[in-house]
Amino acid sequence: MGPIDTSQRLARLRELMQERKVDVYVVPSEDSHQSEYIAHCDGRREFISGFTGSAGCAIVSMTKAALSTDGRYFNQAAKQLDNNWILLKRGFENMPTWQEWTAEQAEGGKVVGVDPSLITASDARNLSETIKKCGGSLLGVQENLVDLVWGAERPARPSEKVALHPIEFAGKSFEEKISDLRKELQKKKCAGFVISMLDEIAWLFNLRGNDIPYNPVFFAYAIITQSTADLYIDEEKLPAEVKNYLGDKVSLKPYSSIFEDAKVLGQSAQNKSDGETSTKPPQKFLISTRASWSLSLALGGEKNVEEVRSPITDAKAIKNEAELEGMRACHIRDGAALSEYFAWLENELVNKKTVLNEVDASDKLEQIRSKHQHFVGLSFDTISSTGPNAAVIHYKAERNNCSIIDPKAVYLCDSGAQYLDGTTDTTRTLHFGEPTEMEKKAYTLVLKGLISIDTAVFPKGTTGFALDAFARQYLWKEGLDYLHGTGHGVGSYLNVHEGPIGLGTRVQYSEVAIAPGNVISDEPGYYEDGVFGIRIESPFFPHLLINLPFLLTPIIDIIMAKEVKTTHKFGEKPWLGFEHVTMTPLCQKLINPSLLSDVEKKWVNDYHTEIWEKTSKYFENDELTRNWLKRETQPI
């Protein structure tokens, strides 16, 4: 998708800024719940800039406009921004951060405005300090100025029905989860927890929604104290079944009343803290470090709130046995769907010489997935990309603006699905013709990195920050790299990107250790701008090692962490490894076996044997896919 002309939108925004005495206006990507993926009505940064990627921040002054984003989107942003915009490439040497660029525009006492519901309290404090150093000031502007520019064309806020998430898949009742949360609050000596993250609320109450595309969440807030559980949600979203399920254990309140109630809580906390009684109960309320500035202000700010990494996000990241079993099961079905798709695609392109574009292909994949048990929908917009498009890390094919798939070029498919028993995210890179030696080398180096993560054994307490280099080492030896993280947490029929764990150089990945029950993607890659892109992605579980005589034992892809027993136990620490769950073959044609060690070849062969054993039963009456799968899982 090419650029749109943003001149009129920027002109109108600047008029509104001038009326409110705002010199610089910040437009974050997130919604008021700090969601990574947002409803269409919250796409303010996309509306004002024309950039459609999921991450970034727009800043508009009276004479300039800038868009900051990360390495996943550099190519896309360069294509989508018109000549009104400057692209700030996050992480590039000598390139200012968006905060630094904003502060530069505020020199000389200028005012920077931002909607306080769209920025976290900690980010607001840090931005304010950066701006002050340049002589400017930060102002929370309650009325969103981009919404005023958008006007009647802004989409309505969705209000989809909420559904129960059955205990057979959740593995734990909402009453147990709330009880566990209250124990955490007691440990921290806090009066309660004000919850704003949508996936945390969905997980806590074992409910799922459909307010944000691809993410089974719903707009709500919650407040949990030692004696009450309040859910702030528009009641028309709740069927009778859900109301009966929540019963008298949860009080339902209007979504719009959260800030009014937060102010009351803040005033009450302040009044109690001003008293003289030595036995007064704890006064502070917990909020997540991801909670909005406006929510913190409503509670009375730092004197009444303690910002912490949410105890719910930590609990949610460690899947219980029902959730882990669901992830295993849905990845087998999803792997079967992908094999059927790749077999179909090869037959259409190579044997039938069918002309297919990238969207035609991704539509077929969704159709195939939808036949499988517990399918609900996609977990993100499928990246179906041929040739040079595969070098755009988060490429999005548009129905009226996409490429014909070239069987003589690399084809990259990054896709996932939501099933009642789990969430999938798999990338496979294929070639239907004769790949070049460079393509095979790049693919094999990426594969070696994936294997290195998958076979890693490490002591308890190791972070994803520390493991990230395992995946990059073979590319680094060739002077190559990729501009995205190596992996992210994956939800259980929830958001496909889930914190707080992951593999990468983000600061947050150095703060939280990998733990048994985590589900993480393993997705190294290599991209040659304008030529091709290679990515292999497979989620896995960390696990506890049991009697491993040596370190390189094959376990694969989305990966699950679990504890394992090693021959030795230095420092009496538990040791962890990974269990793979993705069941989709690698592309044999792109592997250069001469670049693999004997151990790595065994890993590939064992992985492919497991895929055949677990998924071939789906193709007893499908000769095309069965033959394709048989060929692709042969030993190398």
UniProtKB/Swiss-Prot annotation:
CDD domains: APP. Catalyzes the removal of a penultimate prolyl residue from the N-termini of peptides. Belongs to the peptidase M24B family. It holds the Pfam family Peptidase_M24. Gene3D superfamilies: Creatinase/methionine aminopeptidase superfamily, Creatinase/prolidase N-terminal domain. One of its GO terms (cellular component) is cytoplasm. Keywords: Aminopeptidase, Hydrolase, Manganese, Metal-binding, Metalloprotease, Protease. PROSITE patterns: PROLINE_PEPTIDASE (PS00491). InterPro entries: Creatin/AminoP/Spt16_N (IPR029149), Creatinase/aminopeptidase-like (IPR036005), Creatinase_N (IPR000587), Pept_M24 (IPR000994), Pept_M24B (IPR033740), Peptidase_M24_C (IPR032416), Peptidase_M24B_aminopep-P_CS (IPR001131), X-Pro_aminopeptidase_P (IPR050422). GO terms for molecular function: metal ion binding; metalloaminopeptidase activity. It catalyses: Release of any N-terminal amino acid, including proline, that is linked to proline, even from a dipeptide or tripeptide. Its cofactor is Mn(2+). It is an enzyme of class 3 (hydrolase). Mn(2+) 2 binds at residues 414, 425, 537. This is Probable Xaa-Pro aminopeptidase P. Its EC number is 3.4.11.9. GO terms for biological process: proteolysis. It comes from Ajellomyces capsulatus (strain H143). The keyword Cytoplasm does not apply. Binds 2 manganese ions per subunit. Mn(2+) 1 binds at residues 425, 523, 537.
